[in-house]
Amino acid sequence: MATNAANRTNIFSFIPKSISSEVFLVWLINYLDSDCKYGQYKQSFFDNLLLKRDDKGKLVSEISINRQSNNMETVLSFHFNASDERQDILLLFVDKESDMVRPEQLDRYKWIYPNCYRYIYYKTGYVTTIEEQTVSQNQYDLVTDGMMESVLESISELHPLIRIYTDYLNSEVEAFNYYHERLFLNHDKEILHDSAAQKYLLDTLLENIAEDNWSIKIE
């Protein structure tokens, strides 16, 4: 598979994805905040990914990041238009190989970090409809690889590392499109020798069973 071949030359393919996503985003935000010449790119990144729709365009300042060691959460703090009120965003990084975070866990994070400006659930990899519904019902905002790739594409030429990470996300998105085509359009059972394809198939079947949808067919 071409996508897997491309990934073997990408540094991010050698790190657990939830860790690489967190480390990259922490680096990126600090990088964009390091020099005023990046101001418009920082604002674009916040507008397109982190701010609520009604707050897009508000200037972001006094950024700080608090990473929680041995946990999946990172707290991003900032101020609007140099105001005194601090805004906190809780970012949860969920690995593609892990089960989705359960509702009680999502509630627990809200109890630990109350009154956040936003609660963001960043799932690296395939997101089932069930997982998407669980995240929404618990009032978290879902961010996917495809969404992140789209946001980063506009600033990817700023630094080689941004381009590398964007390419990696693109290869991950293409992989799931590839599995879907081979399994459900071409009815190719040989792809099931790939463990990632097996996981994609199981997730898809569980999702359709939960929705009482029996239209999936592999000949």
Per-range role (PLM):
Residues 1-219:
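Charged, terminal alpha-helix-loop-beta segments
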